[in-house]
């Protein structure tokens, strides 16, 4: 199934394709503060479109292996990019940014990112 979403102001939009049955809630320092619910997909399953690249900002911390992208205009974090354990490019879509998402229907798995 295809899902569309964006930041709050619409400057950063995405289309993600896959089966969305469960997401990850992480308690690491950044996820805890952002409140993201993450859906992990391969880079082939996600298409990003930008109103202008000037509105896309990136934040990295700790080991600097995950690019946490956010909108400079509205401050929303719609997705992050990185690599999985096998070196494949992946996206972590914040499902809270998907249009008309009913979070009640999705299983939430909790991950102890503070201890990882």
Residues of each region from the PLM?
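A short Gly-Trp-Pro
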Residues: 1-6, 11-116
């Amino acid at each position: 199934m295809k899902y569309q979403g964006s930041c709050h102001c619409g400057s950063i939009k995405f289309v993600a394709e896959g089966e969305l049955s469960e997401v990850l809630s992480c308690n690491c320092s950044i996820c805890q503060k952002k409140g993201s619910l993450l859906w992990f997909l391969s880079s082939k399953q996600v298409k990003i479109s930008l109103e202008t690249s000037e509105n896309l900002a990136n934040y990295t911390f700790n080991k600097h292996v995950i690019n946490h992208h956010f909108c400079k205009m509205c401050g929303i974090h719609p997705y992050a990019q990185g690599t999985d354990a096998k070196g494949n490019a992946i996206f972590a879509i914040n499902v809270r940014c998907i249009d008309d998402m009913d979070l009640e229907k999705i299983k939430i798995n909790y991950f102890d990112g503070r201890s990882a």
